[in-house]
């Protein structure tokens, strides 16, 4: 399995002032939510207008298919698609594995071994894994119990 370093992503950006603060604090990635049901949703054209010269741009996608994701990525000037829903390996491959961040919730797995098997399954179909706390959703700032078991 590929090994990656940790990186910091500030997600839910909707304003230039928040993006500028994230860049100033050394974040590596900024996340834009493209799930219409989210209170932090941003239109792709609005995300494109935000200046992020010093930080890598990520779109968070929940239910969109590969074609919709690729269209939004182009419009919003995104480098990465964070797959936050029930996306398939085929969807990730169509987007391009080098552009995909796969979200996993360690607390959903019965063991660290089960989580590692899922990561191995996805390893060739994504550039990064994002290990989110809790068992669903995101952005709640809770530490996951399996992270220590993974040696993280």
Q: What positions do the PLM features span?
A:
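Conserved N-terminal beta1-alpha1 strand-loop-helix module at the mouth
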Residues: 1-152
């Amino acid at each position: 399995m590929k090994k990656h370093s940790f990186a910091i992503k500030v997600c839910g950006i909707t304003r230039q002032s928040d993006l500028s603060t994230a860049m100033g604090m050394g974040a590596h990635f900024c996340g834009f939510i493209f799930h219409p049901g989210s209170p932090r949703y941003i239109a792709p054209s609005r995300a494109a207008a935000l200046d992020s010269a010093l930080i890598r741009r990520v779109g968070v996608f929940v239910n969109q298919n590969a074609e919709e994701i690729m269209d939004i990525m182009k419009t919003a000037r995104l480098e990465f698609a964070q797959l936050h829903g029930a996306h398939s390996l085929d969807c990730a491959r169509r987007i391009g594995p080098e552009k995909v961040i796969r979200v996993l919730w360690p607390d959903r797995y019965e063991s660290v071994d089960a989580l590692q098997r899922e990561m191995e399954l996805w390893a060739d179909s994504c550039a990064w894994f994002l290990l989110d706390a809790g068992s669903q959703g995101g952005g709640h700032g809770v530490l996951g119990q399996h992270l220590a078991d993974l040696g993280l």
